[in-house]
Amino acid sequence: MYCDSFFMSRLLSLAQLSGSSWSSICLVCVTSLVFWRIKIAVTQYIRLRHIPSPSIFAAVSYIWLARTTYSGKQYWIHRDLHRQHGPLVRIGPNEITTDDPEILKKIASSGSTYSRGTWYLTGRFNPYHDNLFTILDPFAHKKAKTRSMPAYLGRDTPGLEVIINDKVKQLISILQRRYLAVLPGQDPPLVDLGLISNYFTMDVITHLAFGHQVGYLQDEKDHYNFLGSVRKLWPQMSTSADVPWIRNILFSRPVLRFLGPKHTDKKGFGALMGAAKQHVDRRFDSGEERKHDMLESLMKRGFTRQECEIEGLFLLLSGTESTACAIRQILVHVITAPSVYAKLKQEIDSTCQGRGISYPIQLAEAKRLPYLQAVIYEGIRMRPPLLGLFPKVVPEPGETFHGQFIPAGTSICTNGSSLLRSKSLFGADADLYNPGRFMELSKERREEMERNVELAFGHGQWMCAGKTIAFMELNKVVFEKHCQFFRAFDMQLHSPLKPCEVESYAGLIAKPPAKSSDLSMISRVTDMSRGINPCYRYPPQYRTHLKTHMLNVPSGSNFIRMPIVLPST
């Protein structure tokens, strides 16, 4: 303190000697600002200097973190951090990341006093109200979560699984009607399985949250250009979220009030906000019949119309791209592993032939299929759908992990990329895709491994509220796509050496193709029609004779081209 006062007095004396000109005043201000910033950097460096970091820039500034996030290689860089530097790694002046599941479980335990860091405020899009994601205080968050969880878990929403079933049926129907019904002489249509997965999750969430689907799947259209705008801005928004001084400005209430999305916008997230407002207002004003959906559950528990809008919109932001990403990653890993592909088809065949299975399959039925569960969990493990920092602030008087003291106020972040590739948790072959790792264990050990994978969705009081919905979507879509397509059609990769090009910005984003004509045809068609269970029916126009078609997708973004064979009956 004495040093600071002495330095400032010398600067003021210098300014007085030079005359009270504007240039002298500016010199004093700039020099003072530089000195103040250096002092803060040195102080921050000293308090965590015992924690290893990948770069000196990570210890004294946010240059390393911003560059890593903006590069689109966040997943791969963070995946290798702890193998190189140990269980605790410093990635910012006040940020430490860990892949230790015991630390993460302790932080999220019910009696924990850790609070969320201001990173979570990047989920704020309404300047006047917080949502479940942006409530930082653990006690306030617990109260809000207790109030809304019955809607997410299905306790108040018996129609939850019914809505998802309807969307799965619609997805399968669209793939059959639009991409298999090819008249003689016509070129086969193109299907973008990555994008259509986004449309599926968008319609599921909008129907669950607001009682009405927007029609992404039916129209195969990015309504309001919501998905396009999110993908376009993802690098900038993710980088802004990871740099405190930027996020504190961009996501502050005054800035959101003037520059944030509005209900009156014609496209982007604001336009979707307007559509959500219309549906919520209609439900509140007209007293529509009971629909047993999430909106009704929130209304029953005293949520105002604005709170219903906000929670529904946040569910839309958090539950669409993440679940679609998981669907894409599971599909591409199955297709690139012939042994997995064959075992999964064998389990589905025996399941359909051995006992009656609902259409679409019920979640309880899917959970009884051990290899299907192994495929889903291993797909999530290989490419976790959520890769944010999710920082929690160390409470007073500080904490000690792995013999290292962590001062109070430090943000401890989750490194899901490294956690799910941990060799101590998943075996020496953790870098390899192997669903069989779950099949070789005792029941207790398998359940423990599955719980470690589920850390991708958080834990304890900070667990993702939409986890149940996400697993319901994954089980149904993965089973039905394999049952309706993989059992009937042989699928080949468009580019075996690079089946799917993705970038990582707090999640794995499939890159769009460079140009619409960027594709090549596959001529080999394999007859897979024998042994198809008749309970999986095709529309009448497909039943007259065996037809073969090629189902193509653009290069790069969606990784699959499928030779199609329709079974005769």
Swiss-Prot record:
Residue pairs linked by disulfide bridges in the UniProt entry: none
This protein's pathway: Hormone biosynthesis
Binding site for heme: 464
EC number of the protein: 1.-.-.-
CDD domains, per the entry: CYP57A1-like (cd11060)
GO molecular function: heme binding; iron ion binding; monooxygenase activity; oxidoreductase activity, acting on paired donors, with incorporation or reduction of molecular oxygen
Effect of disrupting the coding gene: Impairs the production of abscisic acid (ABA). Does not affect sporulation, pycnidiospore germination nor fungal growth rates in vitro, and does not alter the pathogenicity of L.maculans.
Keywords: Heme, Iron, Metal-binding, Monooxygenase, Oxidoreductase, Virulence
Keyword Metal-binding set for record: yes
Cofactor: heme
Residue spans crossing the bilayer: none
Induction of expression: Expression is induced during the early biotrophic stage of development. Expression is positively regulated by the ABA cluster-specific transcription regulator abl7.
Assigned protein family: Belongs to the cytochrome P450 family.
Functional description taken from the UniProt entry: Cytochrome P450 monooxygenase; part of the gene cluster that mediates the biosynthesis of abscisic acid (ABA), a phytohormone that acts antagonistically toward salicylic acid (SA), jasmonic acid (JA) and ethylene (ETH) signaling, to impede plant defense responses. The first step of the pathway catalyzes the reaction from farnesyl diphosphate to alpha-ionylideneethane performed by the alpha-ionylideneethane synthase abl3 via a three-step reaction mechanism involving 2 neutral intermediates, beta-farnesene and allofarnesene.
Name used for this protein in its record: Cytochrome P450 monooxygenase abl1
Source lineage: Eukaryota, Fungi, Dikarya, Ascomycota, Pezizomycotina
Name of the gene encoding the protein in the UniProt record: abl1
